[in-house]
Amino acid sequence: MQSPPSESSSTVAPLIPSLAETIRGAWIGLPELKPLDADSDFSSIEGQLEGDDLLIRNELLCCRGVRKIHLELARLGRGLQILHCVWFPDPRFDLPIFGADIVAGPAGVSAAIVDLSPVSGTLPSGIETALAGTPSPAFRQVRDLPGWGTIFSPHVCFIRPDGAEEEVLFRSRVEEVLTILRTAVLQTACEPATAASTIRRYEGQLSYCLQQKRNDKTRRVLEKAFDASWADRYIEELLFDDPLPPG
């Protein structure tokens, strides 16, 4: 795995490295955990955007029940910083999609989101109960979801943290969500590839990926820093690649 972009502590939003460590800690001990191969030009990426260096580092793993764990850390010059993480489940397992994103700039963190998103209409009952029993803190600046945000669960947390205290609360929320997901990964049984429930989850994950690809901001940044063809490959093959058909 590649190391994340390095910066002095004075220029990196503290929430990004701390949340990255929280995420890495959550995948330790998952069943059959192993690195996931990726194209060599996707693991460590350098480009230029309007005179600033764009650095992207990707860490990819998989385990029993999760077809891909992806942690992306990106930095544009000394301004924009991004953390992006998705855990895509194997459709044979009744598991949601974990997603977390942080966007930060010189003024601090402007957006932070975490969710366990359903892939078959509703969350698995055990996860729904666990999330309902540990509600998100009452953050002061809750943000509106984008138009394609129907893919998220009712428990999605999308905020602009108001100061260091709320950044700590958000990290704690991500840790709670990951603990719930870890428990489910360890306990959920594999269903047959031909089961109707597996097919529904496969189709739901296809829909999730399609909706995420509608985020034109990501595509525009990548196209400017590299080119349209490369941006398409990065989005289609790495960020939101479709699951293989079950069976």
Curated annotation (Swiss-Prot):
GO terms classed as biological process: phytochromobilin biosynthetic process
InterPro entries cross-referenced by the UniProt entry: Ferredoxin-dep_bilin_Rdtase, Ferredoxin_bilin_OxRdtase
Keywords of the record: Oxidoreductase
Secreted among keywords: no
Molecular function per GO: cobalt ion binding; phycocyanobilin:ferredoxin oxidoreductase activity
The EC number(s) this enzyme carries: 1.3.7.5
Catalyzed reactions per annotation: (2R,3Z)-phycocyanobilin + 4 oxidized [2Fe-2S]-[ferredoxin] = biliverdin IXalpha + 4 reduced [2Fe-2S]-[ferredoxin] + 4 H(+)
Pfam entry (one): Fe_bilin_red
Top-level taxon of the source organism: Bacteria
Group of enzyme by EC: oxidoreductase
HAMAP family per record: Ferredoxin_bilin_red (MF_00618)
Family of the protein in this entry: Belongs to the HY2 family.
Function (record text): Catalyzes the four-electron reduction of biliverdin IX-alpha (2-electron reduction at both the A and D rings); the reaction proceeds via an isolatable 2-electron intermediate, 181,182-dihydrobiliverdin.
Name of the protein: Phycocyanobilin:ferredoxin oxidoreductase
Native source species: Parasynechococcus marenigrum (strain WH8102)
Encoding gene per record: pcyA
